[in-house]
Swiss-Prot record:
Catalyzed chemical reaction(s): alpha-D-glucosamine 1-phosphate = D-glucosamine 6-phosphate
Annotated active site: 104
This protein's name: Phosphoglucosamine mutase
Any one Gene Ontology molecular-function term assigned to this protein's record: phosphomannomutase activity
GO cellular component: cytosol
HAMAP family (alphabetical): GlmM_B
Domain of life: Bacteria
Requisite cofactors: Mg(2+)
Sequence similarity: Belongs to the phosphohexose mutase family.
Cofactor note: Binds 1 Mg(2+) ion per subunit.
Entries under Pfam families matching the protein: PGM_PMM_I, PGM_PMM_II, PGM_PMM_III, PGM_PMM_IV
């Protein structure tokens, strides 16, 4: 595959007002993507656009709109809406393209652009490369004549539509009545829809992270800071806590005691329930190389399989589609349930866990520890440039660590696809050895 100039593992992402996350690049994305999808025939073409609550969304959104409208694509604006909702609405509104303006779990200073095809799935690498090629050539060609410019409208009921879709994934014979639920929306895209959906299903809802001001998204709250949710669960004596990230495509849960449950355990809860009901497809789960060894062992012990992919929910989804799986995800909390959605959806995943709680009559504390995690350490090392993983000393440190683990664990060292970080993960049955191995690799990376 050719080298990508703009797109990373999850669309285009960066600090607002710095390349590539500038108004100029956003305009080019609109022009290029609009030309690509409009060129297929002569009918009117439609793009739908959602965003999270970052201040820079007010800069990126109009730049994208200008690009799309100038090449003749009609635009529908959703305003703040979760990423999975934009994917769903792309398909339900029969749009040619869906756009989400978000940097997911990152700090407010970052932003990003994610693109979805008419089927609601993220664009392929090949499609992104075609857009990149168009971004760097003759953008003044193919502009629409004055009467052919795109029309732009806001969709006032986008949030209500998504709430109804989400509620439809919850069993009709069940209600959340009697359950006390803390929901942390990270001051992000789900700040209205998530509490409302839970309330309409009967829960007593304690919302937090629902006062976005443009700069507080993900700030000491949401799925990257579950301690805030856990504290409130204990304070309100809630049955469960649910923490979403800024664009609500991932979640973390905590039980009634405030113990945090990560994406691996959430996948295990849902997968085993599906298997018991005879609804698990392809005999297993798709996860990434970062998922805990304990999840793999649990699947094996239950006669199921765990298939691993590179990090990134797009790669998980690709393998799910290839193999016919209906559940996959990441330890970080992306949980994809393809019976309902084309991408990770934190709110839908939370509802499936709640359904298991109700079906079994067990508290979250009894469900949240489906397997004993193998001791695992993850360290992030920031770097300013170059390719640290190509240095001889780093390669030697990794090889030495693998030799020490001697088949009783795993090492994964990789660059982040969204930040200038090297992520170093090791796991195994001996916690002291795992710690030693990670420390050695971290030192090697920092030294280059």
């Amino acid at each position: 595959m050719s080298k990508r100039a703009y797109f990373g593992t999850d669309g285009i992402r960066g600090q607002a007002n710095k390349h590539p996350m500038t108004a100029e690049v956003a305009l080019r994305v609109g022009l290029a993507a609009g030309k690509l999808f409009r060129s297929q025939d002569d009918r009117r073409h439609l793009v739908v656009i959602g965003k999270d609550t970052r201040l820079s969304g007010y800069m990126i959104e109009p730049a994208l709109v200008a690009g799309f409208a100038s090449v003749g694509m009609d635009v529908r604006l959703f305003g703040p809406l979760p990423t999975p909702a934009v994917a769903m609405m792309t398909r339900s509104m029969r749009a040619d393209l869906g756009v989400m303006i978000s940097a997911s779990h990152n700090d407010f200073a970052d932003n990003g652009i994610k693109l979805f095809g008419p089927d609601g799935y993220k664009l392929s690498d090949e499609q992104e490369l075609k857009i990149e090629a168009l971004m760097d050539e003759g953008l003044q060609e193919g502009l629409a004549p004055p009467r052919g410019l795109g029309r732009v409208q806001r969709v006032d009921d986008a949030q209500a539509r998504y709430i109804e879709i989400v509620k439809a994934t919850f069993p009709r014979n069940m209600s959340l009545a009697g359950l006390r639920i803390v929901i942390d929306c990270a001051h992000g895209a789900a700040y209205k829809v998530a509490p409302q959906a839970l309330y309409e299903l009967g829960a007593e809802v304690f919302p937090v992270g629902v006062a976005p001001n443009g700069t507080n998204i993900n700030a000491e709250c949401g799925s990257t800071h579950p301690e805030a949710m856990a504290r409130l669960v204990r304070e309100y004596r809630a049955d469960i806590g649910i923490a979403l990230d800024g664009d609500a495509d991932r979640l973390v849960i905590c039980d009634e005691k405030g113990v945090v449950v990560d994406g691996d355990q959430i996948m295990a809860i849902i997968a085993l329930a599906l298997a018991k009901a005879g609804k698990l497809k392809a005999g297993g789960v798709v996860a990434t190389v970062m998922s805990n060894l304990g999840l793999e062992r649990l699947m094996t012990d239950n006669g199921l399989k765990l298939e691993r992919t590179s990090v990134g929910d797009r790669y998980v989804m690709a393998r799910m589609r290839e193999g016919g799986f209906n559940i996959g995800g990441e330890q970080s909390g992306h949980v994809i349930l393809s019976d309902f959605s084309t991408t990770g959806d934190g709110l839908i995943a939370a509802l499936q866990v709640l359904a298991v709680m109700i079906e079994t009559g067990r508290p979250m504390s009894a469900l949240g520890r489906q397997f004993e995690p193998a001791p695992q350490i993850l360290e992030n090392v920031r770097f300013s440039g170059g390719k640290p993983l190509e240095h001889k000393t780093v390669k030697e440190a990794i090889a030495d660590g693998e030799a020490q683990l001697n088949g009783s664990g795993r090492i994964v060292v990789r660059p982040s696809g969204t930040e200038p970080l090297i992520r170093i993960m090791a796991e195994g049955d001996d916690p002291a050895l795992v710690k030693k191995v990670v420390k050695s690799i971290v030192s090697a990376v920092k030294a280059v």
